[in-house]
């Protein structure tokens, strides 16, 4: 139990008080320094007066710094919420994902009250599950139960697995025959309903028996029946099948429920020596109520962890030391500019203490990983501190949200603040990324936002790209009226049109070549649109609606642009190709500063396009071809600056190998924009065909057409890292 915080400071003895200790140490130190010259303790002695005021201030600061850490993570209008700081409860961190047959069994039993038993089988050769269920005797249409099972399965489906058959199980009906006595005052109808519910619950796959593999026997059942409220004793008690008493009960056993008085002929209830009667309608009503409430009470519940709450303290105002000094020193504590050197000395004390309190005040927002706190204004120091805290969270959860290879190319100009936001977004989702990394796309809910395989979400969150499956990357450049030109893949006519913009190296006089300086551009979205429109008007190469892959990729680096002064006192904005020789004339003019600004705008424009063109697709062939279980096809674009680099591809491959479940194999394909356009079309058609049983052959054809596009991939890697 937390200690009760009293609304006052506990009084200490004079010897234990911090102020007394500080003052004693100060005076001893001053006396040692002064030697034979000593003070008379008058106000005109600034040393002693200052020590008293400063020690009082230090005592107050010590009090303000003495609260439990959790209190400093509470704000006046916001309580302590561990998730805000990336401190997730154990049930989220260590909660098990749905993997085994028992996991699915628990899931269905806790989610569907209309079933009492079920059998789940898994075929490793096809990756298919089969479910047979026993429904309760009271409610539930079979078709609705089948639909619920399929819905719940697909919400929790793992990669390269699928649900095949869902059907009603063949059951063995048992009949209850008994003669027993109840206590006086008990309602016989209610007691009989309790007895039937006890038998039903024992025969069902309740949460406690899912993984226990216990054999159901008459002995165990009778022990439970004797504990039923209202039952005094049993004279006879049998579960009968075809007139034969049963000693063991199979998993598919179900209990016959009486619906009319004739069904109760083999059940006799006594109260004392008097035979009592049963109200059959009331019996059915009570048994139905017990069934519903019993399933609810026995559904799996996760224990709640008691969390500390913390308490906010109004401790952030600092009372200047100068206010405690005599007026004869003529100090100005409320003025920013000190009146004297002594005043400046006092200001320094106050600055240190005030700055410390301000750092404590911003602590909740500094350590927060919530999106709502993204408006926090960062400095160079707070960025360093925040990164240190995020590094701590990385180690806590065993991930790396800031791999070194991701920083090598600055992620298209990602600012330190943007890098923090990317890391925070990744860490906000760390529990589900770790726990559910095998989780697949829900093929029944294709239009639902956020419905993506977990390995895609992990990859995209880590490198900072859009994880939405509806983001069509092959449409990005056409949307901007641009055609990407890869020299080795287009006609000689197009190449000649591009080459007409090139200038040979020998025409570049080094004395006339200048670097392009960095220009600060507007961050306003409307201003950016206007800048891009103006850029397209002023740079002639946009008139062709063509862009070389070299310029598209390497134009993201400002050092590849140059300003060249021509003979007629004009300037040309030049781009130096990296992937083949030559310079490209992007535009010209008499004002060098305008060309520099255009180069900066073009670089930012290309960075945004590159970033927008990056994604990852996950294909599960087994959903179209049952002969290919445990196989994944992972597809990425090959035409962006980062995704075109060999080192970046290798690091992405290592990352994917680390997050893809170990039992799965497959390949990673890096494909061109042209191939991606057809691939995305086939991919979305394939998704829509998964749930249509009449399109079995069509699904295989779509998968084949999709793999034809992958056969010509620029680079292929394997997910199998066993070598």
Regions found by a protein language model. Give the residues of each.
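Membrane-proximal bilayer-interacting regions
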Residues: 177, 194, 201-266, 270
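Single conserved position on a long alpha-helix in the C-terminal lobe of the eukaryotic protein kinase
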Residues: 30-41, 46-89, 176
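Secondary-structure transition/turn motif
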Residues: 133-137, 250-251, 574-580
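Hydrophobic/aromatic interaction determinants used to assemble and anchor large protein complexes
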Residues: 1, 684-691, 699-723
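N-terminal segment of the canonical double-stranded RNA-binding domain
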Residues: 530-569, 600-601
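Carbohydrate-recognition loop of C-type lectin domains
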Residues: 1-49, 95-215, 224, 269-528, ...
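Short aromatic-glycine-(Arg/Gly/Cys) micro-motifs in beta-strand/loop hairpins
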Residues: 561-583
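A short, exposed loop/beta-hairpin motif centered on an aromatic-Gly-Thr core
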Residues: 530-542, 578-597
């Amino acid at each position: 139990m937390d200690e009760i915080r009293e609304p006052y400071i506990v009084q200490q003895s004079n010897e234990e008080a911090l102020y007394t200790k500080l003052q004693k140490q100060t005076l001893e130190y001053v006396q040692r320094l002064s030697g034979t010259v000593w003070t008379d303790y008058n106000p005109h002695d600034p040393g002693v007066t200052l020590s008293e005021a400063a020690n009082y201030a230090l005592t107050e600061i010590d009090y303000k710094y003495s609260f439990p850490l959790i209190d400093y993570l509470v704000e006046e209008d916001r309580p302590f919420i561990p998730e805000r700081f990336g401190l997730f409860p154990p049930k989220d961190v260590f909660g098990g994902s749905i993997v085994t047959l028992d996991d699915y069994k628990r899931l269905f039993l806790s989610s569907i009250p209309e079933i009492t038993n079920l059998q789940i089988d898994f075929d490793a050769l096809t990756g298919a599950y089969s479910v047979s269920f026993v429904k309760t005797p009271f409610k539930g249409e079979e078709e609705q139960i089948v639909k619920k099972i399929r819905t719940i399965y697909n919400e929790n489906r793992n990669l390269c697995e699928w649900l095949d058959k869902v059907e009603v199980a063949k059951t063995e009906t048992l009949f209850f025959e008994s003669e027993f006595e109840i206590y006086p005052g008990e309602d016989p109808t209610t007691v009989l309903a309790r007895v039937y519910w006890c038998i039903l619950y024992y025969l069902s796959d309740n949460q406690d028996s899912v993984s226990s593999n216990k054999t159901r026997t008459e002995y165990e059942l009778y022990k439970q029946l004797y504990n039923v409220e209202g039952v005094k004793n049993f004279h006879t008690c049998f579960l009968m099948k075809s007139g034969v008493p049963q000693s063991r009960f199979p998993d598919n056993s179900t209990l016959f429920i009486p619906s009319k008085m004739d069904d109760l002929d083999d059940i006799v209830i006594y109260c004392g020596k008097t035979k009592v009667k049963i109200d059959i309608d009331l019996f059915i009503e009570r048994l139905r109520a017990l069934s519903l409430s019993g399933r609810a009470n026995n559904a799996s519940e996760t224990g709640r962890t008691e969390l500390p709450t913390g308490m906010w303290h109004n401790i952030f105002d600092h009372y200047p030391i100068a206010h405690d000094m005599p007026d004869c020193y003529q100090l100005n504590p409320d003025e920013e500019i000190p009146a004297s050197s002594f005043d400046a000395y006092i200001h320094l004390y106050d600055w240190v203490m005030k700055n410390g309190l301000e750092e404590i005040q911003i602590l909740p927002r500094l350590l927060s990983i919530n999106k709502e706190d993204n408006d926090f204004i960062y400095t160079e120091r707070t960025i360093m501190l925040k990164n240190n805290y995020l590094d701590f969270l990385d180690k806590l959860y065993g991930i790396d949200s800031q791999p070194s290879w991701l920083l090598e190319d600055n992620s298209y100009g990602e600012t330190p603040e943007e890098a923090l936001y990317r890391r925070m977004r990744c860490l906000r989702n760390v529990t589900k990324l770790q726990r559910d990394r095998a989780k697949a796309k829900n093929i029944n809910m294709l239009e639902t936002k956020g419905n993506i395989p977990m390995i895609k979400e992990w990859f995209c969150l880590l490198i900072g790209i859009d994880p939405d499956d509806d983001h069509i990357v092959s449409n990005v450049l056409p949307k901007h009226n641009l055609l990407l030109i890869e020299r080795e893949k287009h006609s000689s006519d197009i190449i000649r049109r591009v080459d007409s913009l090139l200038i040979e190296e020998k025409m570049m006089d080094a004395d006339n070549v200048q670097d392009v300086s960095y220009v600060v551009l507007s961050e306003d979205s409307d201003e950016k649109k206007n800048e891009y429109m103006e850029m397209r008007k002023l740079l002639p190469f946009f008139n062709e609606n063509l862009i070389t892959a070299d310029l598209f990729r390497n134009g993201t680096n400002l050092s590849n642009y140059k300003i060249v002064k021509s003979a007629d006192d004009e300037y040309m904005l030049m781009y130096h190709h990296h992937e083949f020789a030559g310079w490209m004339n992007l535009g010209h003019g008499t004002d060098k500063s305008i060309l520099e600004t255009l180069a900066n705008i073009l670089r930012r424009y290309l960075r945004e396009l590159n970033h927008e063109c990056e994604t990852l697709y996950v294909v599960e062939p087994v959903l179209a071809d049952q002969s290919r279980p445990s196989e994944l096809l992972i597809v990425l674009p090959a035409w962006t600056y980062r995704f075109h680099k060999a080192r970046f591809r290798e690091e992405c491959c290592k990352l994917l190998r680390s997050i893809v479940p170990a039992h799965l194999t497959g390949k990673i394909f890096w494909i061109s924009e042209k191939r991606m356009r057809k691939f995305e079309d086939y991919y979305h058609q394939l998704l829509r065909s998964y749930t249509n049983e009449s399109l079995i052959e069509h699904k295989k054809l779509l998968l084949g057409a999709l793999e034809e596009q992958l056969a010509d991939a620029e680079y292929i890697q394997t997910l199998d890292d066993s070598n």
